[in-house]
Amino acid sequence: MPLDDRKKKILYAVITDYIMTAEPIGSRTIAKKYNIGLSSATIRNEMADLEEMGYLEQPHTSAGRIPSDKGYRFYVDSILRNYINNDPPISYNTREEIIAEFDEIVKKYARILANITHHTTVAKMPKLNPDRIKKIQLIPVASNKMIFLVVTDTGIVKNYLLNLCQNVDRTIFEFLNNLLNEKIAGKSEKDIFEFLQQDLRQMLGEMAFIADELINTILLSLKQLQETDIYADGTSHILDFPEYKDLGKAKNFFNLLDNKSLLNEVLEPEVDFIDVRIGSENKFEEMKDLSVIKTTYKINGRVVGTIGIIGPTRMDYRKLISEINVMTKELSNLLSSIYNDEI
């Protein structure tokens, strides 16, 4: 059932107050502080309806209400609708003549964003020159198992254990090693994808049953070789929130920031605009009490990385969405002007 204007006003009032105070809010407080034009009793009934609909929660029977993840989502979606075709009403004088390494420029902007927002910011650095596979070696360890060894042109070595659905004669490993090195070693990602999709199964002939394992492993190795560095700034800001005065909860947050592999997935762009994940919407259990606001930065329209803000679900979404929108646009413009002829 869609929310009428009265319920929307009450929901926005609860969210606004909770963002500022971190305390449950009751109907009398809303009636006094917000010019909604309704009695406390009417507001109480509407809040009960909002709770039944899943937009509000009551942490204790005697307490007021707080927003649920569904309530935050409704609030955020209404904010994002205003940003689709409009620039935010604020701007920062952050452009300057910069001669620096690419990563340092991105880190500078992430640092500025952390200082402005008083939140933890994370940035996914691009790999402009990804490693290429120099050599592949398949090593049999059992009749239905092999080690898939990958060596890159920069000396990185990765190995994977493949479990096959059928036994494989050891005599075919020389053929497989020669085939994969001829078709993959030193080749571009585009050429490798074409080989995997169009030619590999046909070339394997009777051994096509191992094609899926080989393809999945090669794609996984390519993905891992392209994984980027993660930079975090403003990590101590989380301690400014009452929710994280608890040492156990704070420790879990800092452990999360140390998990670069998880953050790499969290920052993977899913839409070409500002993306907000609220509490339970995050797929990782470690993120269930947190919200993430992320967006991409670009060079001449090409996405090269992601910047995100991480904090408790009780964050000022309107302010943070505005600020990350401005900063990533500034960063994209600066990078495009500096690296116009290089990328």
UniProtKB/Swiss-Prot annotation:
GO terms for biological process: negative regulation of DNA-templated transcription. The keyword Protease does not apply. Gene3D superfamilies: 3.30.450.40, Heat-inducible transcription repressor hrca homolog, domain 3, Winged helix-like DNA-binding domain superfamily/Winged helix DNA-binding domain. It comes from the Bacteria. Keywords: Repressor, Stress response, Transcription, Transcription regulation. Signal peptide: none annotated. Belongs to the HrcA family. Negative regulator of class I heat shock genes (grpE-dnaK-dnaJ and groELS operons). Prevents heat-shock induction of these operons. This is Heat-inducible transcription repressor HrcA. The lineage of its organism: Bacteria, Bacillati, Bacillota, Clostridia, Thermoanaerobacterales.
